[in-house]
């Protein structure tokens, strides 16, 4: 029988790959149409009903694009809708959330030092936060506040900052950042699925029927598109953050997250202004650099300890790994081959934090990361990188034997 751990690892990889592919498609088409729309030029010779045009060159050919706010005289039977990129990005991201964070909740989702809850409770909180977050956002947009574009943006930013702080009070730092990205992406994809596309269909149907569309549908869709425009870059940051513990695994991670959203605004403002041919506001890059330097500084600020934490107890979900007969030898192996990097204060040159914030110093930490040790150093040679600590083939076999023995013992 094919090993469950190996199959699960490949399933996670497939979901991540699919998620990246669909995200590239969604973000690429989104950025393209934003640039196209802002760069449209009104010329005298445009056909009746045309709002503007753009000439582009790519791949050895020329493209002449015209935008109509009313139905053109010759309406084609087929219209290309840009929506499935968004839907599949969210679905693949949710699948990855289920595989990695729900399937491995005891390790990746729950930090008992932050909040000691069961895996089912943590998963329910996660799901509820995504659903409630969209409802709150949608109600704010539909409230009287929604008529004030910038006032709404400020309130939404406050909501996002609160969610970032809240997630760090519930989950591991890595899961908190992932959830903040998922929360934001849920808003963006729901905007497309529940607001933008339905409103566009109403407008298209009216135009084809020769009716004058209600301007409110376009205004609402434009507002949601504006939000998506400025939220895109922070979501990408949170997608990548689990590789960088200095972002998610530090004392002021929620403040870092808040600043990332401001960086997303300054960067997108430069591109939006440039595409609209309204100049190149270089001040946005100065602000972005200042924010990034502030983030770097925050990542090194020490955490003020408020009490003693018991880090020695092995969680029940991982007891079989610590109780296995191979564990004593594995602990010695990890101590000599891995802990110079995977320590609270790494001694390996150039490391300020342990890779992915994975600590392998105590029985509890080694047992909790048994599957990762098995995959990374037992079944593959990914760890240590370049085999810098000279782990031997026999030692890798020991790691495999330990994991398989513990799993077999649990199943008996």
Per-region residue spans from a language model:
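Alpha-helical transmembrane segments
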Residues: 13-27, 119-129, 174-193
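Membrane-water interface of transmembrane alpha-helices
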Residues: 30-41, 131-136, 192-207
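Membrane-interfacial entry segments at the cytosolic side of transmembrane helices
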Residues: 146-154, 249-253, 275-289
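Membrane-interface amphipathic/juxtamembrane segments adjacent to transmembrane helices
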Residues: 30-73
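Loop-to-transmembrane boundary segments
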Residues: 69-94, 200, 215-234
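Aromatic- and Gly/Pro-enriched helix-to-coil junctions and flexible linker segments
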Residues: 74, 81, 101, 279-284, ...
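Alpha-helical transmembrane segments and their membrane-interface junctions
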Residues: 81, 86-105, 164-178, 231-250
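Short, strongly hydrophobic alpha-helical membrane anchors
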Residues: 1-12
């Amino acid at each position: 029988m094919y090993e469950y751990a190996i199959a699960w690892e490949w399933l996670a990889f497939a979901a991540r790959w699919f998620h990246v592919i669909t995200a590239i498609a969604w973000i690429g088409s989104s950025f393209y149409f934003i640039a196209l729309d802002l760069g449209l030029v009104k010329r005298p010779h445009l056909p009746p009903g045309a709002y503007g045009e753009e000439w582009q060159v790519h791949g050895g050919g020329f493209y002449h694009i015209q935008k109509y706010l009313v139905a053109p005289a010759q309406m084609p039977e087929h219209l290309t809708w840009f929506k499935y990129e968004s839907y599949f990005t969210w679905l693949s991201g949710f699948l990855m959330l289920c595989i990695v964070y729900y399937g491995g909740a005891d390790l990746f989702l729950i930090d008992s030092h932050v909040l000691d809850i069961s895996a089912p409770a943590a998963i329910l909180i996660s799901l509820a936060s995504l659903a409630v977050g969209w409802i709150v956002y949608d109600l704010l947009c539909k409230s009287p506040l929604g008529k004030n574009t910038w006032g709404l943006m400020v309130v939404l930013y406050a909501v996002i900052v609160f969610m970032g702080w809240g997630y760090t009070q519930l989950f591991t730092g890595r899961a908190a950042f992932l959830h903040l990205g998922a929360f934001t992406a849920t808003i963006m994809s729901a905007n497309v699925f529940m607001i933008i596309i339905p409103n566009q269909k109403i407008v298209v149907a009216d135009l084809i029927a020769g009716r004058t569309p209600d301007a409110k549908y376009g205004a609402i869709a434009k507002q949601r598109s504006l939000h998506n425009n400025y939220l895109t870059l922070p979501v990408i940051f949170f997608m990548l953050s689990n590789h960088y513990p200095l972002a998610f695994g530090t004392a002021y991670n929620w403040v870092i997250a808040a600043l990332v959203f401001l960086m997303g605004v300054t960067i997108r403002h430069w591109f939006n202004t440039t595409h609209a041919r309204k100049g190149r506001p270089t001040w946005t890059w100065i602000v972005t650099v200042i924010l990034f330097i502030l983030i770097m500084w925050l990542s090194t600020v020490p955490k003020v300890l408020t009490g003693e934490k018991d880090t020695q107890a092995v969680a029940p979900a991982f007891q079989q790994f610590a109780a296995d007969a191979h564990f004593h030898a594995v602990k010695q192996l990890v101590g000599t081959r891995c802990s110079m990097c995977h320590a609270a204060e790494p001694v390996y040159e150039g490391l300020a934090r342990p890779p992915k914030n994975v600590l392998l110093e105590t029985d509890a930490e080694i047992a909790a990361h048994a599957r990762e040790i098995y995959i990374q150093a037992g079944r593959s040679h990914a760890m240590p990188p370049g085999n810098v600590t000279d782990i031997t083939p026999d030692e890798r076999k020991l790691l495999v034997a330990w994991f398989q023995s513990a799993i077999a013992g649990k199943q008996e």
